[in-house]
Amino acid sequence: DAQEKRQPWLPFG
């Protein structure tokens, strides 16, 4: 997801 590139420190991955 694009959000992972912007905020890779979030547990979305």
From Swiss-Prot:
Q: Which UniProt keywords apply?
A: Amidation, Amphibian defense peptide, Secreted
Tissue specificity statement from the Swiss-Prot or TrEMBL entry: Expressed by the skin dorsal glands.
Q: Where is the signal peptide?
A: none
Q: Where on the chain is Glycine amide found, per UniProt? A: G13
Q: What is its main location?
A: secreted
Task: Write out the GO biological process terms.
Answer: defense response; positive regulation of smooth muscle contraction
Q: Where in the cell is it found?
A: Secreted
Cellular compartments per GO CC: extracellular region
**What is the role of the protein in this entry?**
Induces contraction of intestinal smooth muscle in isolated guinea pig ileum.
Similarity comment: Belongs to the frog skin active peptide (FSAP) family. Peroniin subfamily.
Q: Can you say what this protein is called?
A: Peroniin-1.1a
